[in-house]
């Protein structure tokens, strides 16, 4: 199954009431597809599932990828014509991207993947992710960076991805190996990862789940896929347009960014030297 087919297959009903999922078709399909992979469920709560690779080592630095699966549509559809996808893709398209990296074995083993609910309201799913990590046996798990996946109305005509909503952990944060003095230092860090290209960076974009992870004092940013709305509202059931070429570039860049973050010299096993403040 290629990425376009996976996007169409995952554009299924998935909704919640702020306490529990009330429509679960997409959740069940994701579970079905993950059965053939080396990933197991690290923890599950009413509004989240967190998945880990069988070789994940909690003693090593890790990155959390969070992709919300709740949506506001009543009816769902997805199609592709002449390289342009059309569908109710908030947020099935990024669900499919991260799942495709898992299925292709293109995701670093130190990446945890969370599929969350309630992003469209209070982001309680993000809070439940943190609860799972803090209570993980035998010791709490502290991500060095959180990467939130979502769609954006920015830069559809010119770019295949954007970095938005940059947040940095405070000096008092529990275990950040990557420390940034100011938000602009995190922005420069992201530019340096992909040099010499010049990515679009929007330090404060539309609210998304990254805002909630910031409440837990974590380094965080949103990695967004540009879309074009039909009616001016990405939640309208007419859907949005997404370029097929952009989706592939977005997926490739996500895999690259995750590997580069985990390979950064400051990322040391726990108990190592105090990390340097960047830049």
Regions found by a protein language model. Name each.
Residues 176-180, 189-190, 196-235, 239, ...:
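C-terminal accessory domains and tails appended to enzymatic cores
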Residues 63-65, 114, 145-147, 219-223:
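Hydrophobic/aromatic beta-strand patches that form the interior of the parallel beta-sheet core
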Residues 50-93, 114:
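Catalytic-core environment of secreted peptidases
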Residues 85-184, 191, 201-212:
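Acidic/histidine-rich catalytic neighborhood of metal-dependent amide-processing enzymes
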Residues 67-72, 149-153, 226-228:
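Short glycine-enriched loops at secondary-structure junctions
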């Amino acid at each position: 199954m290629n990425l376009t087919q996976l996007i169409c297959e995952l554009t299924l009903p998935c909704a919640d009431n702020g306490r529990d999922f009330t429509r679960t078709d997409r959740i069940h399909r994701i579970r079905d597809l993950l059965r053939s992979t080396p990933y197991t469920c690290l923890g599950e709560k009413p509004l989240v599932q967190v998945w880990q690779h069988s070789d994940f080592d909690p003693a090593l630095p890790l990155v959390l990828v969070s992709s919300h699966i709740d949506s506001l549509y009543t009816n769902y559809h997805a199609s592709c014509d002449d390289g342009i996808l059309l569908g109710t893709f908030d947020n099935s398209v990024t669900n499919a991207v991260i799942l495709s990296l898992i299925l292709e074995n293109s995701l670093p083993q130190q990446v945890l993947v969370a599929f969350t609910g309630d992003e469209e309201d209070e982001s309680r799913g993000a809070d439940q992710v943190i609860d799972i990590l803090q209570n993980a046996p035998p010791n709490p798990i502290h991500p060095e960076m959180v990467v939130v996946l979502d769609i954006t109305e920015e830069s559809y005509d010119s770019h295949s991805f954007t970095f938005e909503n940059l947040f940095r952990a405070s000096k008092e944060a529990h275990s950040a190996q990557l420390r940034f003095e100011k938000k602009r230092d995190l922005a420069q860090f992201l530019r340096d990862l992909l040099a010499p290209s010049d990515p679009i960076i929007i330090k404060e974009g539309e609210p998304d789940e990254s805002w909630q992870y910031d409440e837990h004092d974590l380094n965080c940013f949103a990695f967004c896929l540009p879309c074009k709305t039909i009616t001016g509202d990405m939640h309208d059931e007419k859907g949005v347009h997404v370029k097929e070429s952009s989706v592939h570039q977005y997926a490739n860049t996500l895999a690259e960014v995750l590997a580069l973050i985990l390979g950064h010299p400051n990322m040391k096993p726990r108990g190592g030297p105090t990390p340097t403040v960047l830049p």
